[in-house]
Amino acid sequence: MTNIRKTHPLMKIINNSFIDLPTPSNISAWWNFGSLLGICLILQILTGLFLAMHYTSDTTTAFSSVTHICRDVNYGWIIRYLHANGASMFFICLYMHVGRGLYYGSYTFTETWNIGIILLFTVMATAFMGYVLPWGQMSFWGATVITNLLSAIPYVGTDLVQWIWGGFSVDKATLTRFFAFHFILPFVVLALAVVHLLFLHETGSNNPSGITSDSDKIPFHPYYTIKDILGALLLILVLTLLVLFSPDLLGDPDNYIPANPLSTPPHIKPEWYFLFAYAILRSIPNKLGGVLALVLSILILAIMPLLHTSKQRGMMFRPISQCLFWLLVADLLTLTWIGGQPVEHPYITIGQLASILYFMILLVLMPIASIIENNILKW
């Protein structure tokens, strides 16, 4: 008799995706982040669900409802901090996952890559709207600043901003709709993640060497299930340490001050995971130019397959490209640091140089380095 997991209509899908899936035998720990992202998403949906049971999306009670969750609800504080720091872990895994895709040339699976970019934008939108919900100072002013960027769109900009606000400023209508969207979007992310996997399983996984691994595949279970469990345990360990020992480490103290439209905080800045994009936005003195640079800083990923000039897929055997990749990582860390600094003399210049370098590496230096490496191979 055939095993039920191979015949049952539902079990068959799970079996072909997570149990008997033929997987390259040489994929490294960098391939763990997909499953870690899945764990983060489930964690966020579950903690978010329990938070939504006690949260009220009204400007007069939103802040106090979050305080109530932390003080009066059984284990409410841990649910709230798991959700807040879970978002940080989510973005760490996301950036590692995208970085691995860039390093090993996974963007040549164009469908999977493009769905991934849509996923990235959706998760960013979800996180932004979630940050508005506690209705602290940084929530309110962050929402005001970021939604205001849309007013840079010619002709329809101002109308669009007021349409999103549901009035002439960020107010009750804005908070209510942001809560509605913040609740629904994770399920959209979940659906997109399934499509992402669907496209990935059409081609099979990439591997560090970048060459086809059809001749050397092993079943996903038990080899990679056990490897993923190790990654998951490390993720849970870091998250637990963060939540139990310094839950506010990555947050902004200004968000413990209730939103006040009459008092602007000295430094308006988003959560740490958006600082690199915020630095790129601020580095351009023109409003529309800044908004375009902000969008392009992520959208540039979509043209990576077109910029791939190398004869090899990954960077495993390409030292010049490797140096440029790590320069890009250092540049992004610099941008993240600059995004959190005030708009003053040395920071402005550093931010502008780092922004130029970011686009230079991706658009100019990496394709040229690949061509040079191709020529070196001929010798």
From Swiss-Prot:
One of its GO terms (molecular function) is metal ion binding. GO terms for biological process: mitochondrial electron transport, ubiquinol to cytochrome c. The keyword Transport applies. This is Cytochrome b. Binds 2 heme b groups non-covalently. Component of the ubiquinol-cytochrome c reductase complex (complex III or cytochrome b-c1 complex) that is part of the mitochondrial respiratory chain. The b-c1 complex mediates electron transfer from ubiquinol to cytochrome c. Contributes to the generation of a proton gradient across the mitochondrial membrane that is then used for ATP synthesis. Heme b b562 binds at residues 83, 182. It comes from the Eukaryota. Heme 1 (or BL or b562) is low-potential and absorbs at about 562 nm, and heme 2 (or BH or b566) is high-potential and absorbs at about 566 nm. PANTHER family: CYTOCHROME B. The chain crosses the membrane at residues 33-53, 77-98, 113-133, 178-198, 226-246, 288-308, 320-340, 347-367. Its main location: mitochondrion. Its cofactor is heme b. It is a multi-pass membrane protein. Keywords: Electron transport, Heme, Iron, Membrane, Metal-binding, Mitochondrion, Mitochondrion inner membrane, Respiratory chain, Transmembrane, Transmembrane helix, Transport, Ubiquinone. The gene is MT-CYB. A ubiquinone binds at residue 201.
